[in-house]
């Protein structure tokens, strides 16, 4: 039994005494304890060494007091498992070779045996679960098909997604073939994470806002829905969070995927989101990560504003406090601790 299951209960929109909190990228460079480990190894080796991945996953639980842990990994491990060479240099960016731009390239990508190619993630989950000793839930995750598609086609990050969109508009069938292939791997990967012990799952669509509403409905949402439905069919009790960054105009479409919770970017009023969604799903978010550069008083004021905007909880509502994107690497850990402590103290009045 979990000692602290507030996060899971909030995702399922069950009554909780306060609002649970965790933050994206909470295991990361802002923590000196993380940097000490990173000095000895490169990023992907850290992801692939279960003992180290488990250690950094648990650091924010011990140091900051968050209500959930998220397994330390990277969304691009899926691309690598499919046969792409992935280089992640934290200060210089991301390079994937060869970029996938033709039918021949797509055919060359493999549908991997997940345990064989990504077994290190499952080992990290199993080890983390053991070491967490039921203190808090553990989140597994994957990138969404559209985001992993853009990395594959662009060969890295991109400002305008020219190659990805060229394939979408010139060769839509080819684009769907690649998206479908990636989606198949994502779904299997997420299911395996649950088998390894993940208590909840998050699907990150980091580049969601690159698409128009109609294109998002055609090239992104069907694949998210495919994964969500597969998870819900096999593991109906495992909550699924969808984070389609900055897709504020199609919230109800995202809710229609069958997800339990939706991550909200910081550029939308959480009250408006709740009103539109009518408590159909739990809302996760949505403080601007740069607020954590502010004074403790400013951090508390902004957190109080979000809690107040979300408003009083009902029998159907759910809110998990989070940032609208990942925590930035140069934030003072004391500022995050201030936020976490404040949300724990301030939120009970809304429950």
From Swiss-Prot:
<feature type="binding site">
    <location>
        <position position="206"/>
    </location>
    <ligand>
        <name>substrate</name>
    </ligand>
</feature>
<keyword id="KW-0456">Lyase</keyword>
<dbReference type="Pfam" id="PF01208">
    <property type="entry name" value="URO-D"/>
</dbReference>
<dbReference type="GO" id="GO:0004853">
    <property type="term" value="F:uroporphyrinogen decarboxylase activity"/>
</dbReference>
<dbReference type="InterPro" id="IPR038071">
    <property type="entry name" value="UROD/MetE-like_sf"/>
</dbReference>
<comment type="function">
    <text>Catalyzes the decarboxylation of four acetate groups of uroporphyrinogen-III to yield coproporphyrinogen-III.</text>
</comment>
<dbReference type="GO" id="GO:0006782">
    <property type="term" value="P:protoporphyrinogen IX biosynthetic process"/>
</dbReference>
<keyword id="KW-0210">Decarboxylase</keyword>
<feature type="binding site">
    <location>
        <position position="151"/>
    </location>
    <ligand>
        <name>substrate</name>
    </ligand>
</feature>
<comment type="pathway">
    <text>Porphyrin-containing compound metabolism; protoporphyrin-IX biosynthesis; coproporphyrinogen-III from 5-aminolevulinate: step 4/4.</text>
</comment>
<comment type="subunit">
    <text>Homodimer.</text>
</comment>
<feature type="binding site">
    <location>
        <position position="74"/>
    </location>
    <ligand>
        <name>substrate</name>
    </ligand>
</feature>
<feature type="binding site">
    <location>
        <position position="325"/>
    </location>
    <ligand>
        <name>substrate</name>
    </ligand>
</feature>
<protein>
    <recommendedName>
        <fullName>Uroporphyrinogen decarboxylase</fullName>
        <ecNumber>4.1.1.37</ecNumber>
    </recommendedName>
</protein>
<dbReference type="InterPro" id="IPR006361">
    <property type="entry name" value="Uroporphyrinogen_deCO2ase_HemE"/>
</dbReference>
<comment type="similarity">
    <text>Belongs to the uroporphyrinogen decarboxylase family.</text>
</comment>
<keyword id="KW-0963">Cytoplasm</keyword>
<dbReference type="InterPro" id="IPR000257">
    <property type="entry name" value="Uroporphyrinogen_deCOase"/>
</dbReference>
<feature type="binding site">
    <location>
        <begin position="25"/>
        <end position="29"/>
    </location>
    <ligand>
        <name>substrate</name>
    </ligand>
</feature>
<keyword id="KW-0627">Porphyrin biosynthesis</keyword>
<dbReference type="GO" id="GO:0005829">
    <property type="term" value="C:cytosol"/>
</dbReference>
<feature type="site" description="Transition state stabilizer">
    <location>
        <position position="74"/>
    </location>
</feature>
